[in-house]
Amino acid sequence: MSGPSSWRRAATVMLAAGWSHASPAGFRLLLLQRAQNQRFMPGAHVFPGGVLDAADSSPDWVSLFAPRHTPPRFGLGPEPPRQPSFPGLFHGDADGAALPDDVALRICAIRETFEEAGVLLLRPRDSARASQEPSIALSPPAGLADWRSRVRSDPRCFLQLCAHLDCTPDIWALHDWGGWLTPYGRSSRRFDTTFLLCCLRETPRVEPDLAEVVGYKWLSPSEATECFLSKEIWLAPPQFYEVRRLENFASLSALYRFCLDHPLEVPEKWLPIVLLTSDGSIHLLPGDELYVKGSDFLEKNMSIDKKTEEIVTEGKVVNRIVIHSPHLYEIYMTLTSKSEHGYPKSYTAKKSCTARL
């Protein structure tokens, strides 16, 4: 059985980029296809990211950020309040850590994006951090394959790459978005993953590493939904939920402006509780009337001797993902939020979609 001490911390970045072609979609998201031989979510389309490494909080980063950006915050703004995201899963900065937790997680996401996709979210060391426009990814360096191999073998080499390019990780371009904890039973490997968002003016060149990642797609939120329903791609429930949440924004500028004007004071991290019904399953999320706060379901699922449709019909206050099949999810939502970030709208698949599944 997996316990709290066995959870692995991770960071992922949702890259939203402008689109040069005529299209009603205001932006597209980078989704990477994981290789089938991967232990966790084989074949899935995911946002770039990976596991936090000790190298991501190395004190050597301090001198690279200097002199323009100094500790402890390196210009990120006020430190977010520390509070447990879930009982038994409190993560504060390690005692004596050279970098704050949210800085290290950003470096992790940027490093993993380079490893998996060859995209460099860096900026010149002497550049100002403030910008009223989305960022631009750095062009891949000469010897991309060699550098990527070195970083994959030893994450400390990512700092060497940044020093070689006279750049720093563009931690200021990554905005807090939220986070997800792997629910019980999804996999023997469980992750505490911070979700970040980065807006880019244009789509950068993507070069999958052809090891962990074998392909990629740039898709608008609506396109990603359609590709999922048509079985062209597979999304895990958290990715599907976030794709639908991003549907709230009509354009890249609206999304970027929201990130600048509404920084999250306390980024939420959710643990879905899996409710097993007699004919399917439902992922219950915080705020749902059936969601149980506390650690009771950290290591087990809920179950009920009712059909999924009965549970859906009875629901009054809901925030849930109904899993009908691997390629058919529905979102039921009655909660309200003061901002676009809050929640996705309810989403039920069209009958034409269900007929072909």
From Swiss-Prot:
* Motif extent (Microbody targeting signal): 355-357
The organism's place on the tree of life at top rank: Eukaryota
The secretion signal range is: none
Q: Per UniProt, which keywords does this protein have? A: Hydrolase, Magnesium, Manganese, Metal-binding, Peroxisome
Any GO BP = coenzyme A catabolic process
Answer yes or no on keyword Glycoprotein. no
Which residues are involved in binding Mg(2+)? Answer: E112, E116
Gene Ontology molecular function: coenzyme A diphosphatase activity; magnesium ion binding
As its record notes, the protein acts as a catalyst of: an acyl-CoA + H2O = an acyl-4'-phosphopantetheine + adenosine 3',5'-bisphosphate + 2 H(+); CoA + H2O = (R)-4'-phosphopantetheine + adenosine 3',5'-bisphosphate + 2 H(+); hexanoyl-CoA + H2O = hexanoyl-4'-phosphopantetheine + adenosine 3',5'-bisphosphate + 2 H(+); octanoyl-CoA + H2O = S-octanoyl-4'-phosphopantetheine + adenosine 3',5'-bisphosphate + 2 H(+)
The UniProt site entry described as Important for coenzyme A binding is assigned to R34, F40, R189
Chain location of the short sequence motif Nudix box per the record: 97-118
Where in the numbering of this chain does the Nudix hydrolase domain appear? 10-242
Kindly report, in one word, the top-level EC class recorded for this enzyme: hydrolase
Cofactor(s) listed: Mg(2+); Mn(2+)
Keyword Magnesium assigned:
yes
- Cystine residue pairs: none
Gene3D superfamilies tied to this protein: Nucleoside Triphosphate Pyrophosphohydrolase (3.90.79.10)
Tell me where it resides: Peroxisome
Q: What does this protein do?
A: Fatty acyl-coenzyme A (CoA) diphosphatase that hydrolyzes fatty acyl-CoA to yield acyl-4'-phosphopantetheine and adenosine 3',5'-bisphosphate. Mediates the hydrolysis of a wide range of CoA esters, including choloyl-CoA and branched-chain fatty-acyl-CoA esters and at low substrate concentrations medium and long-chain fatty-acyl-CoA esters are the primary substrates. Highest activity seen with medium-chain acyl-CoA esters and higher rates of activity seen with the unsaturated acyl-CoA esters compared with the saturated esters. Exhibits decapping activity towards dpCoA-capped RNAs in vitro.
Subunit: Monomer.
In the record, the note on similarity to other proteins reads: Belongs to the Nudix hydrolase family.
Instruction: Give the protein's recorded name.
Output: Acyl-coenzyme A diphosphatase NUDT19
